[in-house]
């Protein structure tokens, strides 16, 4: 069997690939995730996903390497992972009662070519109270997640509805990723 590598240390991406019953190994890429040039959110996630995959694929050229990057976008502004609880609260206030997009760039590099794509999911939040925001922040859950929330955790209660791929919001558009890996010959 050909080697499949996830170029990510994300526990959520690991769980999703395990859900698909795939045999893979994890080799985090440890790249600089800053985008120094001006890019659209779509271009930014695609570029970061490619950089992550390429950093690993350069050392494993005969393997299939998956790189991914996920961001939350509200009114054309990228909301990354909050650095402080205050920043998390500000992000959640922005998202409260509004719609936003979750974008995941995916790069699959293989001996048979590559697949690069961006998956976009629209998420609608209920109006949140200050108590809900602070109770959620007190759990610590929002601190390592883009947009300061994880749909698969307690923040599921904030989501009114979504349009698109649920797993994309978790961190990896699973079915499309698996189909692309197989299309490339894995």
From Swiss-Prot:
Purpose of the protein: Nucleoside triphosphate pyrophosphatase that hydrolyzes dTTP and UTP. May have a dual role in cell division arrest and in preventing the incorporation of modified nucleotides into cellular nucleic acids.
Main location: cytoplasm
Site annotation Important for substrate specificity: residues: 12, 70, 152
Enzyme Commission designation: 3.6.1.9
Cofactors, names only: a divalent metal cation
Catalytic function, reaction form: dTTP + H2O = dTMP + diphosphate + H(+); UTP + H2O = UMP + diphosphate + H(+)
Record-linked PANTHER family: BIFUNCTIONAL DTTP/UTP PYROPHOSPHATASE/METHYLTRANSFERASE PROTEIN-RELATED, BIFUNCTIONAL DTTP_UTP PYROPHOSPHATASE_METHYLTRANSFERASE PROTEIN-RELATED
Record protein name field: dTTP/UTP pyrophosphatase
GO cellular component, as recorded: cytoplasm
Annotated gene: maf
Organism listed in the record: Geobacillus sp. (strain WCH70)
